[in-house]
Design a protein with these regions (language model features):
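Cytochrome P450 heme-thiolate monooxygenase catalytic core
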Residues: 164-166, 271-273, 333
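A translation/RNA-centric and nucleic-acid-associated enzymatic feature enriched
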Residues: 180-261, 282-359
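Short coil/loop linkers at secondary-structure junctions
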Residues: 163, 266, 299-303
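Flexible helix-coil linker/hinge segments at domain or subdomain boundaries
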Residues: 258-271
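Short, highly charged C-terminal tails/helix-capping segments
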Residues: 269-282, 286
Length: 359
């Protein structure tokens, strides 16, 4: 009988070991997928794709008993060779191949050139071959940024005494009303997909004081614009025993600062790949809803048409205004009108036409 203790010794070299000094001029084993092959005749550069990134290997014909023509992009392989320092290679290391074991091979040539820096193909082609297009460096980087944001959200809220919860995504009714609900039959009873975990969060605040969730929400949006999504990952938190709604704004500001710091420190490679310049969250201005409307109307000679909500153009102009005037990348808009806020938004006791809420 065998008992497992949670440890497993692998002969494959770790990424950290490949990057370190200990394996220089030593034999190492690398596993991954062949991302690209550059055949120079007697020498070929075989780029191996791993979860950490791309690693350059070098195949010299006279050093091996097989041909470069035996290798294909998309193969998964186990490579044995000697690690050398090479400043021109990605990460300053390369592995000189001595042996290659093919673990799997594509049945036919890849329909997408995933080794290119950017996938120059249609959205339809990307989705039709999604399991392949996701292997492109830029496509992978987007998922790492998503990981960074959810990781930062969890870590920051854990550090601030929050409890993570997991709420149902099928319910009898929506949390925010309206017609943008995905309706379905739940064992012959009407049901909807969750728009928001709002009511569950409020329920659990009575249990744990501070709760959060990262999970999918669904909106049956009938508009095909960049402002509308039918499904997305929502980062939600709820906290009790607050002195002011501004305490929530402070918590959100702290999270944004934490997330930007994590992205800079642990995801610099992905930011570079995507050519992303991080916004500044060090100081975020807050402006009342009615004041924001007046500022935009005056600055950009724009008439206020809807006194109860922000039009898309107004939202863009508010961002533009605070960038121009204060070099701010974020802005809080507070005190939305009671008429446009859900019933659980607290009225401002000094003027019940407005709420103690923000976006």
């Amino acid at each position: 009988m065998e008992f497992l203790d949670g440890s497993w010794k692998k002969e494959v070299s770790s990424w950290d070991a490949l990057m370190g000094e200990e394996l220089l001029n030593q034999e190492a084993i690398l596993e991954g997928a062949i991302h690209s092959i550059r055949n120079m005749g007697d020498v070929a550069f075989v780029i191996i794709r791993r979860r950490e990134g791309l690693f350059q290997t070098v195949l010299v014909n006279e050093d091996v008993d097989f041909s470069i023509h035996d290798l294909k992009e998309g193969m998964t392989v186990r490579v044995k060779g000697v690690v050398n320092k090479e400043e021109r290679a990605p990460h300053g290391r390369e592995l000189h191949i001595r042996e290659i074991q093919v673990l799997s091979s594509p049945a036919e040539p890849l329909p997408l050139a995933i080794d290119k820096w950017k996938l120059n193909t249609s959205l339809e082609a990307k989705l039709n071959y999604r399991s392949l297009s996701l292997r492109n460096i830029q496509e992978r980087a987007r998922f790492k940024i998503q990981e960074a944001l959810t990781r930062a959200f969890r870590d920051y809220l854990y550090e601030n005494g929050f409890t993570e919860i997991h709420t149902p995504k099928i319910g009898a009714r929506g949390a925010e009303g309206g017609a943008n609900l995905f309706k379905l039959s739940y064992f012959h009873k009407p049901a909807v997909l969750a728009q928001s975990p709002q009511f569950y969060k409020q329920m659990m605040v009575g249990v744990f004081d501070r709760v959060f969730e990262t999970g999918p929400v669904f909106r049956a949006e009938k508009h095909n614009t960049k402002r509308h999504l039918n499904e997305y990952t929502s980062l939600d938190f709820e906290m009790g025993y607050i002195d002011s709604f501004e305490e929530i704004m402070a918590m959100e500001t702290g999270f944004l600062q934490y997330a930007m710091k994590l992205l800079k420190e642990d995801y610099a490679k992905e930011l570079e790949i995507l050519k992303v310049e991080l916004p500044d969250a060090s100081r975020i201005p807050a402006v009342r809803f009615d004041v924001a409307k007046e500022l935009v109307a005056k600055k950009y000679n724009r008439q206020i048409r809807n006194p109860f909500d922000l039009e898309p153009e107004e939202e863009a102009l508010i961002g533009q205004y605070f960038k121009e005037e204060y070099n701010a990348d974020f802005v809080f808009v507070t005190h939305y009108p009671s008429k446009k806020r859900p019933f659980y938004a607290m009225d401002d006791p000094e003027d019940t036409r407005f709420t103690l809420s923000f976006d």
